[in-house]
Amino acid sequence: MAKIKITWVKSTIGYKFDQAATIKALGFKKLNQSVIQDDSSAIRGMILKVRHLVVLEEVI
């Protein structure tokens, strides 16, 4: 399965609680942290919800 690298680049302060919960569900603990996740439809849906807070890269 393909992998994607997600980097959290913008704080959740001032945004809705569910967006902060989505950031935590993706596995982030600190700002500017990167995580590698499987490229699945569930992960893609979470990324769409917080697309203004993260940067996405494909891992080969």
UniProtKB/Swiss-Prot annotation:
Q: Which InterPro entries match?
A: Ribo_uL30_ferredoxin-like_sf, Ribosomal_uL30_bac-type, Ribosomal_uL30_ferredoxin-like
Q: For this UniProt record, give its keywords in alphabetical order, as a comma-separated list.
A: Ribonucleoprotein, Ribosomal protein
Give Gene Ontology CC terms. cytosolic large ribosomal subunit
- The reply on keyword Nuclease is no
Q: Which domain of life is it from?
A: Bacteria
Quote the subunit structure annotation. Answer: Part of the 50S ribosomal subunit.
PANTHER family registered for this protein in UniProt = LARGE RIBOSOMAL SUBUNIT PROTEIN UL30M (PTHR15892:SF2), MITOCHONDRIAL RIBOSOMAL PROTEIN L30 (PTHR15892)
Annotated protein name in UniProt: Large ribosomal subunit protein uL30
Q: Which gene encodes it?
A: rpmD
